[in-house]
């Protein structure tokens, strides 16, 4: 058993894999729930749907990508197969797919069109493949179904270029035979590690965890270093993509928000890097429903979610469901475009370089100037033995500021536990963990001296990013 001091140093030594680090840098990306449910006006299909129902008359994947990019998103994940088992690509392993639909006379491939559009648009492409299949008779029979599922994973992982993410839902209901399948997760992971080694495996995967709700909220202190047991994703199967029953959409409260504090990790034998993804939808449902056209989240609502997630060491996965024509609906596009504008406005005026910056301590190789040089691989580190520090920015004349953005150097671990921001002797903001990014917004103030106090850290704090905005 480690001593408390040894345990904290152990926690500070846990670092992300290259694939996790690349994923974290995306920050904000899209989910597109599209498939048979779009045409039946349901959220969950039962697998008995006729492929003839799938017939978008104006599918435009480039329009999807343009809508995604208008909000500043950098990737898109497509629901290639939802629980109903209908496949958006002409899989060789089932007849329940687009090849038996009237769309493009059975010659179409939604996965191909979307993956190609993502590459044309300069964003990354990912896939969602539900392991629960309410159509296929092999579901619930063990290895025969696993063979089928792995065959489909292999098709997606080999025929559509690089995939940045494979998103696994934890839903596990009954199949046609009334049985549930025991998923062979380790086999699925092994196939994907071989075929797409750079892809993160999310939610029911070992790389990225679910935040615990689909309301768009994350914890006050969202640690990426957590006990290894969380990788089991036990809550996902019972809570992921459920009906909005109040429990599903509530904000996380103090009783279950602590998953990485000193107290929680004190006796953990193994700690892992398992960062958080916040997933939510621009609409009430995950699939498109025409009656929800008047209930699209506003840009202001989406901005609050963005700042609460991306600004608190999580990434944001925002669902935007295409309609029955195969296009992103006009109300959704309008909210996304306005959201992108609002995000740009917040970060339009970086005034950091106007200030002279100092830190109470630093090691020689990593001075405080490396936190503000705009380089991804340089960083400030406090002197050895320091578990708190103060950074001071002095402006030559009063400067209006309203936002400070901080980011740790994750290849050396997540360390900062808490801090404060002071403007000319008055505290204007407090923060908990920093991790990849902490966005601190406060009422605009005019300031000569801005002070950032790191009040607690697991060993010496680091910052690769420090930016002050007007």
Label each residue range with its predicted role.
Residues 398-400, 411, 457:
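Short, surface-exposed acidic/glycine-rich loop or hinge patches that mediate macromolecular interfaces
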Residues 458-470:
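Edge beta-strands of jelly-roll/beta-sandwich modules across compartments, strongly enriched
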Residues 447-453:
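Extracellular beta-strand ligand-recognition surfaces/modules
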Residues 401, 416-418, 449:
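Exposed beta-strand and adjacent loop surfaces of beta-rich binding modules
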Residues 388, 396-403, 447:
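Extended extracellular/luminal ectodomain segments enriched in beta-structured repeat modules
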Residues 1-387, 393, 405-407, 414, ...:
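Mature catalytic domains of secreted/periplasmic carbohydrate-active enzymes
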